[in-house]
Amino acid sequence: MNVAYAKIEIGLPAPIRVLHASDTHLTHADERDGQRKVELAKNRLACFPEADERLAALGKLSLEMELPIMHTGDLIDFVSLANMEAAKAFADSHDIFMATGNHEFSLYVGEAWEDEDYRNQSLAKIQACYKNDIRMSSRVIRNGDAAINFVALDNGYYYFEPRQLAFLKEQVALGLPIVLMIHTPLYERKLYDDARARSGGCAYLAGVPDELIEDYEPYRYRQQKTDATTAEFLEYVAAEPLIKCILAGHLHVDYDSTFAGRIPQLISGGSAARVVEFY
């Protein structure tokens, strides 16, 4: 696994360092889940042949550097007993704080419309693999007088919920600098343009203005259309001075973006771990 480095100035009296990773996409399955799942695993392994090696390297790096892992989702590629066992074993033996992605709840990868009902089919089983609430939680990390509140929220389906916005406001009220952890990056124009050029289709971002997704094919338009709460969420983040950085994934490319003209948005593509030092 490659290792990248970033330094983000947020005015701390002492530095705080973490490991950011995303989109590992473990592809394990065996006979316990049936032949269809075994075949899915074989097909998806071709997309992510180094997933196990990268996760092992990430864990080794975390232990050697004594840094917590801030993972922004898709640690597994689909729901299976073997994937859940691997995820739980990793979480039990490493310091990992998790913001879920969309693939955490994917049963067969693209076989159905993914929404709250779809997610809830496997949510309890996936949640049991991790120590923190993977849909909405916070963790304060300190170094002497320095402190950062890492706030992990699930936006794997391209939207935010009212309760997530309320939770973020509660965290802001604590008065600590915040690093927002999400799976799907937030829209800003340069990232949008680059993402569309790279994909040849849609941008796969949250909060894209409607006029910029009108030419998406119908499935992607429905999937990525910004609702009122998501628009309000982005407006709040843009205006809140305590939100200092965003960690994200989903795009399968390492990319440094700036949200709202001021907030660094660090996107992990899955092939590298990034040591992020806040100071």
Predicted regions: what they are:
Residues 57-68, 149, 158-256:
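His/acidic metal-ligating clusters that form di-metal
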Residues 18-20, 69-71, 98, 180, ...:
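Residue-level marker for buried hydrophobic side chains located in beta-strands
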Residues 23, 73-74, 101-102, 183, ...:
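Active-site glycine-centered loops adjacent to acidic/histidine catalytic or metal-binding residues
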Residues 7-10, 80-179, 203-206, 256-278:
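Extended active-site neighborhood of metal-dependent phosphoesterases/phosphodiesterases
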Residues 22-53, 107-130, 190, 222:
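Acidic/histidine-rich helix-loop elements
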Residues 13-36, 105-106, 181-205:
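Short, solvent-exposed beta-strand-terminating loops
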Residues 44-48, 73-77, 154-159, 219-224:
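The substrate-binding groove and active-site-proximal loops of carbohydrate-active enzymes
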Residues 1-84:
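N-terminal active-site segment of His-dependent metallophosphoesterases
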